[in-house]
Amino acid sequence: MALQRPKGTQDHLPDGSPKLSRDVQASAFAYVQDTARRVLERAGAQFIATPLFEEAELVRRGVGGSTDIVRKEMFTVYYFGDHGGYVLRPEGTAGIVRAYLQNGLKQLPAPLKLWTHGPMFRAENVQKGRLRQFHQVDYEALGSADPLVDAEAIWLMWEVVRELGLTGVRVKLGSIGDPADREAYNAYLRDCFTPHAARLSDDSRDRLTRNPMRILDSKSTGDQALIGELQVKPMLDFLGEAASSHFAAVQAYLRAWNVPFDIDPAIVRGLDYYRRTAWELHHQGVGAKSALGGGGRYDGLSTQLGGPEVPGIGWAFGIERLLLALEAEGVTFPEESGPLLFLAALDEEHVARAAGLALEGRRVARVEFAYRALKPANAFKEADRRRARYAGLLGSDEAERGVLTIKHLASGEQQEVPLAALNTFLAERAR
């Protein structure tokens, strides 16, 4: 049997590849990353990169031992001789906060805005929009508890999808309060669900003792039916004065900036480190609960990791899920452009010289060349196949006169360019 890529992964392929599966074009992937980078760096966010694997204890303490990620979805790395307790990262925030604490980034001006992108790993049940290796764009703002920072984070996430051209996106906004608020709410939920525990799914019965709020996020239709039947009160009814005031301020900022949102009292983020502001972006084109991504405030995460208290807020969206939404709306992205010039020798004697001219030309533009001599018609055909803007020919006649015959493929116009002026010709057209 032919070797296959692992289940729950994708190949990122060059433009023009035959579409045989759900693999993605690398240029579309890069376009999403570049759009996010442009939006976030205009806001002052700086790029950070952390390892693809971290200590398992970091993930357990950061993400939370009661989460599905820790209990069911982590990929453990066993084969390091010096340490057996590593896992492939299932999300980005815990690693970024670890890097912030370990490297003394608290000395930098606050809020410190950081962003990254890269692969994450979870042992998911593979379906549309859910992969075992997936890629995220991640934004974090550390060092401020101001609700204005929350609103800016939501605006930035909204701005990325707006610049990509998506229109069918909804922001679902909620608050999960402070720790005391959540403790009171969890007590209320235990009182609600304990008499009906036999009707809960196995996962939710386990959550009843560990973290009852996670029952509200259950994928079981039976659990959701029971929640409706019991008319379970939302977390918003249990917000204390401080959390309630914070939530109202976030909403006021978003309204002032014309960011459309819906209050969703059922918002329960899947990671234990969240508090206060929480939100998700939804689109019906991505399947699997329709979430493109989400975020929230996590002021207690740094202390869970053994550091001083550092307020923070962040978000992440899945690039593959965003591509599904773009596909569903028929949004197209620019394909990777071809070379400015494709250069070919007309006889074997001049192949090396043509290649040398191409190498010199690469100092100012993208230039490709033929690795063997071609007839003019074949050179033009190959240049067109590579989506080049110009085709250049070097034969005995051109070499003797010190020129290059250059054809503009779209118009068919031809001209001769002195070899010594080739880089000037390219630089003028590469702008």
From Swiss-Prot:
InterPro entries: aa-tRNA-synth_II, aa-tRNA-synth_II/BPL/LPL, Anticodon-bd, Anticodon-bd_dom_sf, His-tRNA-ligase, HisRS-like_core, HisRS/HisZ. It catalyses: tRNA(His) + L-histidine + ATP = L-histidyl-tRNA(His) + AMP + diphosphate + H(+). PROSITE patterns: AA_TRNA_LIGASE_II (PS50862). Residues 1-20 are annotated as: Disordered. One of its GO terms (molecular function) is histidine-tRNA ligase activity. Its EC number is 6.1.1.21. The keyword DNA damage does not apply. Pfam families: HGTP_anticodon, tRNA-synt_His. One of its GO terms (biological process) is histidyl-tRNA aminoacylation. It comes from the Bacteria. Belongs to the class-II aminoacyl-tRNA synthetase family. Homodimer. PANTHER family: HISTIDINE--TRNA LIGASE, MITOCHONDRIAL-RELATED (PTHR43707:SF1), HISTIDYL-TRNA SYNTHETASE (PTHR43707). This is Histidine--tRNA ligase.
